[in-house]
Amino acid sequence: MKMKRARIVDLLSTPDFNRKVCVKGWVRTRRGNKNISFIELNDGSTVHGIQIVVNVVKLGEDSLKSITTGACIAINGLLVKSKGEGQKVEIQADEIEIYGIADPSVYPLQKKWHSLEFLREIAYLRPRTNTFGCILRIRHHLAYAIHKYFNKQGFFYFHTPIITSSDAEGAGSMFQITDLDIANCPKTKDGEVDYTRDFFGCSTNLTVSGQLEGELGALALGGIYTFGPIFRAEKSNTPRHLAEFWMIEPEIAFYDINDNMDLAEDFLKYIISYAMKYCKDDIEFLNNTYNNELIEHLNFVLSNRFVRLAYSEGIRILEQSNEEFEFPIYWGIDLQSEHERYLVEKYFKCPVIMTNYPKDIKSFYMKQNDDGRTVRGMDVLFPRIGEIIGGSERESDHQKLLKRIKELNMSMDNLWWYLDTRRFGTAPHSGFGLGFERLVLFVTGMQNIRDVIPFPRTPKNAEF
Amino acid sequence: MKMKRARIVDLLSTPDFNRKVCVKGWVRTRRGNKNISFIELNDGSTVHGIQIVVNVVKLGEDSLKSITTGACIAINGLLVKSKGEGQKVEIQADEIEIYGIADPSVYPLQKKWHSLEFLREIAYLRPRTNTFGCILRIRHHLAYAIHKYFNKQGFFYFHTPIITSSDAEGAGSMFQITDLDIANCPKTKDGEVDYTRDFFGCSTNLTVSGQLEGELGALALGGIYTFGPIFRAEKSNTPRHLAEFWMIEPEIAFYDINDNMDLAEDFLKYIISYAMKYCKDDIEFLNNTYNNELIEHLNFVLSNRFVRLAYSEGIRILEQSNEEFEFPIYWGIDLQSEHERYLVEKYFKCPVIMTNYPKDIKSFYMKQNDDGRTVRGMDVLFPRIGEIIGGSERESDHQKLLKRIKELNMSMDNLWWYLDTRRFGTAPHSGFGLGFERLVLFVTGMQNIRDVIPFPRTPKNAEF
């Protein structure tokens, strides 16, 4: 078929009827009788299919036999206003070409309700469903909005390394990378693995955060952001954990904790409103199919100013509440999800940015307050999912940073370069991390993080 | 300093003089006498510094002592038209705050010429140099242009997995990933590594290409693209090889090889012209400092239509040329860089897209031509660097694909899901891969691929 293919999303919104068009896509359903057949065709450009009307007598019954759910076809026909209900336009087929059949006796995606659990097992096919089409389009638009936002701010996309010889947080389970034959590792005289013979000449891991390298970028280019894959070798089989996920980490020179909070709020509101504008149909589909509070939650974030709340004040509010919590409340605890949700959903009824955490529950690199016991960390707390962003102003004073590292008995052998940034032209700076899948969960309203990434990596699963 | 910080790139182009401004950045140089001091300040937003004029008597000589190359400072002052040559505006300082000193006796980046080799050793500091500032800003704008282009085409950013249990090309050196204790691996009764006890329950590697998973996306969403890190465990210590690099792989349903070639040409022209527009100063700096043919090369690509050239015709031209080549020419060879450059730089004098390669030098998944000996692969050949893009129309026929796999004695145990796309609703489709660093090399005019990524990973080097 030589006519230029039109995307269905464009045809559904065109005011320009009564013209010949060509569409190509996958059959969702076919129904009808011996005279007329209706095909719902989807090409992935939108959750909505376009209706193809086929004159069975004219095109021949035989040509329709293999047009079953999942088959791939091309249609030339006339685009007309639809007489039927439920759609605005339809195509009267002149010509049909079959690219690929999908034998109903073996094709797993038939026209019926498939559970999300079942679809997870056939992750290689699930992008062809309406649900995952919606999720993946939203995922795209969120990613695009993130680049657009930071580009507009004048921040530069900075590729921090995936393979690393240092551990960004002084903790965390990491995957090891090697090109040694692990069945038969070369050993040193002491019986240790001889890493001088490994590809990089040392032991290497998959990164758990790009922040420390990101700081190097910020202290040179002013403002940077990362957007790349991050890995955790935690054997947590939960709806909230992935071994491989994507993370966004802006880092900005000359930003203090207040600038950082303002940025986080503005950023989240921008990307969520972008998604609501450009993924309207997809969000509506998910709202109506899975989670009828979804749009409400999104508007909740957009229409409220995020409350700034010191940790100590948060503890006071929780202590004085009459709520029964599973975990006890006292100054020094790491807040649990139940506490965060109480503050956001019941007490303030708006997103909360909590700051000035006890230093003992936060990372070594956070800027120390003068009180000697708190640091300028910040967590952005959302309804339903709790923490969506974690960040801080960074300790820019070389001596204070060294002292804290000593207190924590950390080895900084592999991080001398990080400390050097505080020796050479140090500057106040801040940043935060946003787990991309956490964001996609929030904007799609899905419950399981394995449903918002194309090919989830979890314990015992690296398929496709 | 409570005044809002202005970015130097904005001040250098403002028509709005004689107002108080605040700038923050790193000192490139300071010179002057006992009455007046000139500081060149850079904040990473542009390659150009802004000149700060300091009345030494007014601000006190002592306050200036630690303002040496690399120090980080904040300035409040009056933005005025410059009387000096070489700059349009300058700032008359009212107030200076020192954020961080950079002791000249230890700070490695002094005001002198540093070789690229030396800067590679201090990769953690080199973003602070003019050269790497330019490269990294260009890198950002190219990445942004890529997202912008595909978004406009209606293609969706699709995250293919980094950790994989399959080898995309049936070849290639891969890094292994594990959370086993490799010094003491669990073994099966047969003495093999017991991968059932590894994190994913099987042997896993870092991906060498997202293409195969990308095809799953394209055959559901219509058009997708990937942009993520790719890994090769090849011990090649050359200016063209990295163990970790970034790759862009669009994959589009219903595109044939001609659509694919048109897309590749339009795409490359778009992103290169975007860079020339948004990175004008940076490209000029690199042109004038390292490679005075850079801008010429970029214009060469923009102003010429890319020639479409069948491999067989290319061989004929090479055979009939009077050029002396190191490697012999005959039908069936994989072209060498010298051949590609002859065709591009001497014969056609324009970029070339070569197609219809002998099947034996290309991958199993390329669409087979009717002649039984060629496939619909395509390489885009550029001046100076040779192949910048490699792609193909994919074999969409299940039987032909199976037959080819058998011919090649490939094991497809881990790729049943890939074959399934040809069983269920298969469609003609095409795609290509662009090595991002190869592109950045071309647009920056740099010679060594280690100089166009922030933290290069190469044999024996995973530092920072």
From Swiss-Prot, chains A, B:
GO molecular function: asparagine-tRNA ligase activity; ATP binding; nucleic acid binding
Disulfide bonds: none
Chief location of this protein within or outside the cell: cytoplasm
SUPFAM superfamilies associated with the record: Class II aaRS and biotin synthetases, Nucleic acid-binding proteins
Coiled-coil intervals, chain numbering: none
EC number of the protein: 6.1.1.22
Gene Ontology terms: cellular component: cytoplasm
PANTHER family: ASPARAGINE--TRNA LIGASE, MITOCHONDRIAL-RELATED, ASPARTYL/LYSYL-TRNA SYNTHETASE
Protein's name according to its UniProt entry: Asparagine--tRNA ligase
